[in-house]
Amino acid sequence: MQEIDVRGLPPPEPFLNINAALQSLEASETLKVLIHREPYPLYDILRDTGYTWQTTALADGNYEILIVRNQ
């Protein structure tokens, strides 16, 4: 599982870093993202490009997103 931490980065850096990491995922591989806010625009892109994800709100106010490339 790959992991990236984009907490605290100003826009558009979180999206750019997540997108770059997604490009290197193999089918069925998971990317774990730590981010300081819930990235709603990212969800539309993930849905449209064949990824599934699970978002968990963490006790410290951050979010953990597990993203899987479907094929």
Stretches with model-predicted labels:
Residues D5, L34, L66-V68:
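Generic structural detector for well-ordered beta-strands
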